[in-house]
């Protein structure tokens, strides 16, 4: 190219109007709520950009944007144009000098058609109320101190106004299968969780500003939305934020944007930052991580060892603050314990230990490296050393009081925390796999246990601290104590003795009642043992009743004879003229006992019918079983 041609091109470029500002479609959408045709915004409150749209293109120099503060002459703002597809032309003006941008003063702006000498549109605004901040930059995200926590820090493009901005965080799990972008799961809205980053010229903001409670985004469950739909947000007022409730071991994406706080400065939400991804460490509970101390000086941590993988433990101490001062803690190696059987087999647990103190919080991190070389991180819950005191295994002693009734005693492993120690006792029958667990009261040193007689059991005991001063994990179970309960002979002897005592007491009570209260004794005796009736009196009454109900004539039958006998009357001799009495006295008569079966049909006539009234025989035998023997004598 000739030198003169290069000179002309350079001159044309220098003389051409500069494209002073560019307004993106995203900026236009953020200002959609502004109904003014002439729209303005400020990124840092030290600049000002205004624009408007025209449907028809116009020659260069047709329009002019003028501005003026009160009692000042109008000045023109240099314009640049942008072609808008299917719409027209967009005219943009950016104030050239920072001194022309003043806060808290009304600014009068109007658009003038130079050729027609007409005002196209006009507006009065305050620069401090049209803020549209740029998205935060240098966003850093990492796992927090708790499993499922995410710690985010960022820097503001304009640090001078960062104290007058509030921030919004949007995040969600990263889905590698979705090539169009991550699906927004949930957004949280709350107040600040940590204050702004501490700068060299500022005061200790970490100690001055309070911290809000961490949010729980997954408390109500995830809610899937479309990629274009915005959900709720997490609001913060500083350069760091700590959120919780995420799923440990998952990957997340996040974005940030800012807005004037509405108190000192006003405006609209700015655009979202570029997405940042972060991998959260897994929960060390999956490895069975357990840390404890026996002497409040040395801490031992153990976790399950995985096959074909190596692991390493790390720790660091932090002060008790709501917002962490150390954004990027320095992890120290936890000294690994030597294996007792190297090369024989993979141990079940990996162990490491380190020295600690009781003036800071302990954080534990375990890194597991698999055979392909992939590193997986697992984070444990932070703890104080007095919350991880592990007691030695207690000793269990027992003795059988009676059949199936045991008295248990155990020796307290720590006399300095006897009232803060709780126990668990479990037992099972021989040949059974199910354990029954009992929890004695806090601080108990013994108890009783009732088991089935003539059975065999296994008993175990363990202890842990659970008081206001010390806490810790459960100790290991004691060695199984085998118990064989006795038979129920003692119970039978007890019942027999009880019956004897009750019987003797009853006899003594009756004797005492007879001696002290005879009348009550007689009533009690008649109530318990009624007297037998008089048999003679009862029989006599029975005979009288039977005679009254018997017929006047009775028949006597003698089954021993074939011919029925007849009643004979023995008359005296004719020489004896003296009449004999019809019935003599009982003392002068002989009686012959007859069989009752022979008297069934025999008619008896003790008193003849010719006898006078009142001369009936006095020897009336009611049962008709006897007859006078003299009546049967031969004449």
Curated annotation (Swiss-Prot):
Expressed at a low level in a large number of cells of hematopoietic origin. Isoform 1 and isoform 2 are always found to be coexpressed. It comes from the Eukaryota. One of its GO terms (molecular function) is thrombopoietin receptor activity. Its main location: membrane. Residues 172-281, 392-486 form the Fibronectin type-III domain. Phosphorylated at Tyr-591 in response to THPO stimulation. It holds the Pfam family EpoR_lig-bind. Residues 205-232 are annotated as: Disordered. Changing residue 591 to F: Exhibits enhanced and prolonged ERK1/2 activation upon THPO stimulation. The modification Phosphotyrosine is found at residues 591, 626, 631. It is found in: Cell membrane; Golgi apparatus; Cell surface. It is linked to Amegakaryocytic thrombocytopenia, congenital, 1: An autosomal recessive form of congenital amegakaryocytic thrombocytopenia, a hematologic disorder characterized by severe reduction of megakaryocytes and platelets at birth, and evolving into generalized bone marrow aplasia during childhood. Homodimer. Interacts with ATXN2L. Interacts with JAK2 and TYK2; these interactions increase MPL localization to the cell membrane. Interacts with THPO. Interacts with SHIP/INPP5D. Interacts with BTK. Interacts with SYK; this interaction negatively regulates THPO-mediated ERK1/2 signaling. This is Thrombopoietin receptor. It comes from Homo sapiens.
């Amino acid at each position: 190219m000739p030198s003169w041609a290069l000179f002309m091109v350079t001159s044309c470029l220098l003389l051409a109007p500069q494209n002073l500002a560019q307004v993106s479609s995203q900026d236009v959408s953020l200002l959609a709520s502004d109904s003014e045709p002439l729209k303005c915004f400020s990124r840092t409150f030290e600049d000002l950009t205004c624009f408007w749209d025209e449907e028809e293109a116009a020659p260069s120099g047709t329009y002019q944007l003028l501005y003026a503060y009160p009692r000042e002459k109008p000045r023109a703002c240099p314009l640049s144009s942008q072609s808008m597809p299917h719409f027209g032309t967009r005219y943009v003006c950016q104030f050239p000098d920072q001194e022309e941008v003043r806060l808290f003063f009304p600014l009068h702006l109007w658009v003038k058609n130079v050729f027609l000498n007409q005002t196209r549109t006009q507006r009065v605004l305050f620069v401090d109320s049209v803020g549209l901040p740029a998205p935060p930059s240098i966003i850093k995200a990492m796992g927090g101190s708790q499993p499922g926590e995410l710690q985010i820090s960022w820097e503001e493009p304009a640090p001078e106004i960062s104290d007058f901005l509030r921030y919004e965080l949007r995040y969600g799990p990263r889905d590698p299968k979705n090539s169009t972008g991550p699906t927004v799961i949930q957004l949280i809205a709350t107040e600040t969780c940590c204050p702004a980053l501490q700068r060299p010229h500022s005061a200790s903001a970490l100690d001055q500003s309070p911290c809000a409670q961490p949010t729980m985004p997954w408390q109500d469950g995830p809610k899937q939305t479309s990629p274009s739909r915005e959900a709720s947000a997490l609001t913060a007022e500083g350069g760091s934020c700590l959120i919780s409730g995420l799923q440990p071991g998952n990957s997340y994406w996040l974005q940030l944007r800012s807005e004037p706080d509405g108190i000192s400065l006003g405006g609209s939400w700015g655009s979202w930052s570029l997405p940042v991804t972060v991998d959260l460490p897994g929960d060390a509970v999956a490895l069975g991580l357990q840390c404890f101390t026996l002497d409040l000086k040395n801490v031992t941590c153990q976790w399950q060892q995985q096959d074909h993988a190596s692991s390493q433990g790390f720790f660091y101490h932090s002060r008790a603050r709501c917002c962490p001062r150390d954004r990027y803690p320095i992890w120290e190696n936890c000294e690994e314990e030597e294996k007792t059987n190297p090369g024989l087999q993979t141990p079940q647990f990996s162990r490491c230990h380190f020295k600690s103190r009781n003036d800071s919080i302990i954080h534990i991190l375990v890194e597991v490296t698999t055979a392909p070389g992939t590193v997986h991180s697992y984070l444990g819950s932070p703890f104080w050393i007095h919350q991880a005191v592990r007691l030695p295994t207690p000793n269990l002693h027992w003795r059988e009081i009676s059949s199936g009734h045991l008295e248990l005693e155990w020796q307290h492993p720590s006399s300095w925390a006897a009232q803060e120690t709780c126990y668990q006792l479990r037992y099972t029958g021989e040949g059974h796999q199910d354990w029954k667990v009992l929890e004695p009261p806090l601080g108990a040193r013994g108890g009783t246990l009732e088991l089935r007689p003539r059975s065999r059991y296994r008993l175990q005991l363990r202890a842990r601290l659970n008081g206001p001063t010390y806490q810790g994990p459960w100790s290991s179970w004691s060695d199984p104590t085998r118990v064989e309960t006795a038979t129920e002979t003692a119970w039978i002897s007890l019942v027999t003795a009880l019956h004897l005592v009750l019987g003797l007491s009853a006899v003594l009570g009756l004797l005492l009642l007879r001696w002290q209260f005879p009348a009550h004794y007689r009533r009690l005796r008649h109530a318990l043992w009624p007297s037998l009736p008089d048999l003679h009196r009862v029989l006599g009454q029975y005979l009288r009743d039977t005679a009254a109900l018997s017929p006047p004539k009775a028949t006597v039958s003698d089954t021993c004879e074939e011919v029925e006998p007849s009643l004979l009357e023995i008359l005296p001799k004719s020489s004896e003229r003296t009449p004999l009495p019809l019935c003599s006295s009982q003392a002068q008569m002989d009686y012959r006992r007859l069989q009752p079966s022979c008297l069934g049909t025999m008619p008896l006539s003790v008193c003849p019918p010719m006898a006078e009234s009142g001369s009936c025989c006095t020897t009336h035998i009611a049962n008709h079983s006897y007859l006078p023997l003299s009546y049967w004598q031969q004449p």
